[in-house]
Amino acid sequence: MTSVIYPGTFDPITNGHLDIIERSAVIFPRVLVAVANSPSKKPLFSLEERVELVRQSVAHLSNVEVFGFSDLLANVIKQHNISAIIRGVRTTTDFEYELQLAALNRLLTKGVDSLFFPPAEKWAFVSSTIVREIYLHGGDVAELVPEPVFNALKAR
């Protein structure tokens, strides 16, 4: 079975992330969403909270699995027998950075390629960073994030 992995910090998961997961789930029989610990980023939500929010957000997708990780992505890829890495790219700046990561991951995994998904046009401007900024300044992020995330933000 072809398995792909979509790694990220997902702090929080946005509708842009969800769009990429949903599109991947149509193409591939098994999609793993790997939520990175990333303590250096000073996340708004803990790893456990982020994993749970992603799980709730993808509950309608039967071929999607969600887990947290703290290891090197290349090691996670080897452990799960991954065929490809899914990455979202919004801008040329994203693409340049992701191209470097793709080359590094291909080397470290002995050949696993990265597949780049541009966002749907309506999500091209959305990022977790922007969502956090809007939220921290009292703005409404309801249209930018899945309902479980919006509810979790309201409860904070």
UniProtKB/Swiss-Prot annotation:
Site note Transition state stabilizer, residues: H17
GO biological process, one term: coenzyme A biosynthetic process
Spans traversing the lipid bilayer: none
Binding sites annotated in the UniProt record for ATP: T9, F10, H17, G88, V89, R90, E98, W123, A124, F125, V126, S127, S128, T129
Gene: coaD
Organism encoding this protein: Haemophilus influenzae (strain 86-028NP)
Record text on subunit structure and interactions: Homohexamer.
Cellular component aspect of the GO annotation: cytoplasm
EC annotation from Swiss-Prot or TrEMBL: 2.7.7.3
Catalysed reactions, as listed in the record: (R)-4'-phosphopantetheine + ATP + H(+) = 3'-dephospho-CoA + diphosphate
UniProt name for this protein: Phosphopantetheine adenylyltransferase
Keywords per UniProt: ATP-binding, Coenzyme A biosynthesis, Cytoplasm, Magnesium, Nucleotide-binding, Nucleotidyltransferase, Transferase
Pathway(s): Cofactor biosynthesis; coenzyme A biosynthesis; CoA from (R)-pantothenate: step 4/5
Protein residues bound to substrate: T9, K41, L73, R87
Cofactor or coenzyme needed: Mg(2+)
